A protein has these predicted regions:
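C-terminal cap/substrate-recognition subdomain and adjoining C-terminal extension
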Residues: 2-5, 95, 99-117, 124-239
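Alpha-helical substrate-recognition element adjacent to the catalytic core
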Residues: 2-147
Length: 239
């Protein structure tokens, strides 16, 4: 998922292409973005369309991309327009389940076979991301995403602002936490957007993904940029 990143990028040293490939091969863990990476869609845009406010939210996303507001502010304002109920979210998942990007199932399966831990880190919503994780046999405790809150009658009540993924720079915070919690030495982040790129460091390497949408800023700054998961699988199968 790509969104506004107010901070400037400060990568002191980006790994070279060959270094990035080597880091993937010997990774302890691989972290994937979800929206426009593991799945074809942007979850919040799909939810907005489903709730009949797609145009308004798309316009707000476009304005926010200019860097005029933080991730949390932009998320708060978009959700205040959508105001989805629990019933609407459940119906979206049932009627329009997230579509996996071709090749992701095979890639995750191969990573699991190599005993490389796989995590999903998303600025999207946990209720949707958990559905994706289940399809990929990723344990739910390996999912980090924002939690929607609802009143007892199912009406929208906001989101959990304490989650690291609710903040700008949140994906990097999650990776730092994973390294500390599990003792991972090498963690690779894969994603399509600026919030994924900025998670390296603390990630050991970043791989840009353009299989669903190509973001020029990310492509330019990625030492390894792929447009299909098959490219990553092919590299891993060389050994």
């Amino acid at each position: 998922m790509s969104f506004v990143v107010v901070e400037t990028f400060a990568h002191s040293m980006m790994a070279t292409l060959s270094q990035t490939k080597e880091l993937l091969r010997r990774a302890d863990a691989v972290c994937f973005d979800v929206d426009s990476t593991v799945i074809k869609e942007e979850g919040i845009d799909e939810l907005a369309k489903f709730c009949g406010v797609g145009d308004a939210v798309t316009e707000m996303t476009r304005n926010a991309m200019g860097g005029s507001m933080t991730f949390k502010t932009a998320l708060t304002e978009r959700l205040s327009i959508i105001r989805c109920s629990r019933e609407q979210v459940n119906k979206l998942i049932t009627d329009h389940p997230p579509q996996l990007t071709p090749g992701i199932r095979e890639l995750v399966e191969h990573l699991h076979q190599r005993n490389i831990k796989v995590f999903l880190i998303s600025g999207g919503f946990r209720c949707i991301v958990e559905h994706v994780a289940a399809q990929l046999n990723i344990p739910l405790h390996h999912v980090y995403a924002n939690r929607l809150k609802f009143y007892f009658n199912g009406e929208y009540a906001g989101f959990d602002e304490s989650q690291p993924t609710a903040e700008s720079g949140g994906k990097g915070k999650v990776i730092s936490m994973l390294k500390e919690q599990y003792g991972f030495k090498t963690v690779v982040m894969i994603g399509d957007g600026a919030t994924d790129l900025e998670a390296c460091p603390p990630a050991s390497a970043f791989i840009g993904f353009g299989g669903n949408v190509i973001r020029p800023q990310v492509k330019e700054r990625s030492s390894w940029y792929v447009t299909s998961f098959g490219e990553l699988l092919k590299e891993l199968e060389k050994i």
